[in-house]
Regions:
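Short glycine/serine/proline-enriched coil/turn segments at secondary-structure junctions
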Residues: 160-163
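Long, low-complexity segments enriched in small/aliphatic residues
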Residues: 208-232
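Conserved short internal alpha-helix adjacent to the catalytic or cofactor-binding core
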Residues: 165-169
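SAM-dependent methyltransferase catalytic region
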Residues: 1-152, 157, 170-172, 176-201, ...
Length: 232
């Protein structure tokens, strides 16, 4: 489906007069698109579960850039969908982020970090709740202990995905230590989409303010409101 979608994109501007050259211009994508369970490798999965789980072998591949929108799936749904898969995520502390009532996207963040080259970048759009829920404490610890956080852009109450009710953010990590990170809040989503000036507010924050505990983030623009609430 992914390959077919990309090929359709290539044909967007074609018409009846150019379709005769359609076949030659289509690239062979067999060496560019792969599929499988990227959270588990062949050595992680018993032979009897291999067909069900379809582990993916990255081998020694490491990446300069990983970008994506990983699946959001609660622990209960992982167990319902594939109980054998859930057990393997939690086996022998394979994923430190497989903690309490974790969400599957926690694992994707951890996996991506481990697949980055030194100085490599990870950019994911994920639910903002990982900054607050107790189950994500081990994921927050992984990020903060290694000072990976570079940028977080919060969409607040703006709904990024049509027909879905998710409160999301874009998180950018770099496999290098950062003493500061940039935090921004989108105030006008429609304006932000076309990169209009003033669509968001931002500030730089010290990495030392973050730990495995709940992340309370705000821009300078909203600091006075938080101070007022705190005083009261």
């Amino acid at each position: 489906a992914c390959k077919f979608g990309l090929l359709l994109k290539l044909l967007e501007d074609e018409d009846v007069n150019t379709l005769s050259s359609f076949r030659p211009i289509l690239p062979n994508m067999d060496n560019n698109i792969f599929y499988g369970n990227s959270l588990l490798g062949p050595n992680d999965v018993p032979v009897e579960f291999a067909e069900e789980i379809n582990p993916f072998d990255f081998g020694e591949r490491r990446f300069d850039l990983i970008v994506g929108n990983p699946p959001y799936m609660k622990t209960e749904d992982i167990k319902k969908f594939s109980p054998n898969e859930k057990k393997l995520y939690e086996k022998n502390n394979r994923y430190v982020s497989a903690h309490k009532q974790y969400d599957k996207y926690f694992l994707f963040v951890e996996r991506a970090v481990n697949l980055l080259k030194k100085n490599g970048y990870l950019g994911y759009i994920i639910p903002s709740k990982f900054m607050k829920v107790g189950a994500a404490s081990t994921l927050r610890k992984l990020i903060t202990d290694n000072k990976l956080l570079k940028i977080i852009t919060s969409f607040g109450a703006h709904q990024v995905f049509e027909g879905k009710s998710n409160y999301t953010c874009i998180m950018i990590l770099q496999k290098n230590e950062h003493d500061q990170f940039k935090y921004s809040e989108v105030e006008d989503f429609a304006a932000w989409r076309i990169r209009t000036e003033g669509a968001y507010s931002f500030c730089n924050r010290e990495a030392s303010i973050l730990s495995e505990n709940t992340w309370v983030l705000y821009t300078d623009k909203h600091k006075h409101l938080l101070d007022k609430i705190t005083r009261n």
